[in-house]
């Protein structure tokens, strides 16, 4: 315990506060600057290597010292990585230019559409007899011709629909008339049947029309008004139905 307390007393106040932040600025001393460069360069190369291995990334590192000495690192090839970088920058610039061109094109098309919409709105107002102050005599004549042409087309279509409606109503009237006649005939037939059924002593023979009779021997109809000179006299009297 005494050794531990003595060790605690020997720790300086700076050690207790921990490592402070180092101010980032140019090192004026040449020797110190060179030493720092070597240390930081090695650390940077180590970090680049670790990044390429851990993350499977293509890394290229180029460093020039203050004296112009070159230091480089690449897990593949510095030249190949630089070419890939140039291509990526070119593609991104082309993509930006294409996007800009597309945006400009769509803006122009939108302007054209807005102009067309404005013209159509003005024409509609002119057809309604509004906003005529900006039209000259020629424009007014053209507008009048267009309106008259449109009115003639509207009238022709209206007459076509009216004629079709009249034709349909006429056919409908004929159908209704035929149905009415058929129903009247059915009603009259039903009334006659009911009257015949209500008559007393009615039988199947009552259905025979008047002024006609039946010859019981041969069931031939004989006119009651005709004489019997045309028929041979029968010796036997005719049968009578009871």
UniProtKB/Swiss-Prot annotation:
PROSITE patterns: K_BOX, MADS_BOX_1, MADS_BOX_2. GO terms for molecular function: DNA-binding transcription factor activity; protein dimerization activity; RNA polymerase II transcription regulatory region sequence-specific DNA binding. This is Floral homeotic protein AGAMOUS. Probable transcription factor involved in regulating genes that determines stamen and carpel development in wild-type flowers. Residues 103-193 form the K-box domain. CDD domains: MADS_MEF2_like. Expressed exclusively in stamens and carpels. InterPro entries: MADS-box/MEF2_TF (IPR050142), MEF2-like_N (IPR033896), TF_Kbox (IPR002487), TF_MADSbox (IPR002100), TF_MADSbox_sf (IPR036879). Keywords: Activator, DNA-binding, Nucleus, Transcription, Transcription regulation. GO terms for cellular component: nucleus. It is found in: Nucleus. GO terms for biological process: positive regulation of transcription by RNA polymerase II. SMART domains: MADS (SM00432). Residues 19-73 form the MADS-box domain.
């Amino acid at each position: 315990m005494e050794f531990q307390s003595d060790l605690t007393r020997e720790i300086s106040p700076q050690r207790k506060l921990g490592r402070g932040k180092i101010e980032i600025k140019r090192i004026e001393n040449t020797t110190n600057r060179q030493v720092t460069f070597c240390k930081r360069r090695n650390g940077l190369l180590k970090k680049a290597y670790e990044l390429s291995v851990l993350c499977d990334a293509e890394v290229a590192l180029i460093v020039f010292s203050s004296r112009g000495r070159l230091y480089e690192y690449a897990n593949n090839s510095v030249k190949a990585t630089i070419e890939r970088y140039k291509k990526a920058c070119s593609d991104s610039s082309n993509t930006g230019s294409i996007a800009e061109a597309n945006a400009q094109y769509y803006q122009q098309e939108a302007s054209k559409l807005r102009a067309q919409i404005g013209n159509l709105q003005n024409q509609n107002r002119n057809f309604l007899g509004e906003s005529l102050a900006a039209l000259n005599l020629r424009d007014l004549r053209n507008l009048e011709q267009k309106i008259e042409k449109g009115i003639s087309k509207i009238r022709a279509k209206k007459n076509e629909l009216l004629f079709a409606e009249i034709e349909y109503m006429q056919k409908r009237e004929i159908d209704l008339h035929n149905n009415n006649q058929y129903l009247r005939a059915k009603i009259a037939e039903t009334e006659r049947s009911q009257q015949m059924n209500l008559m007393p002593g009615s039988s199947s023979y009552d259905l025979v029309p008047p002024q006609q009779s039946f010859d019981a021997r041969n069931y031939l109809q004989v006119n009651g008004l005709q004489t019997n000179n045309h028929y041979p006299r029968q010796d036997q009297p005719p049968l009578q139905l009871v």
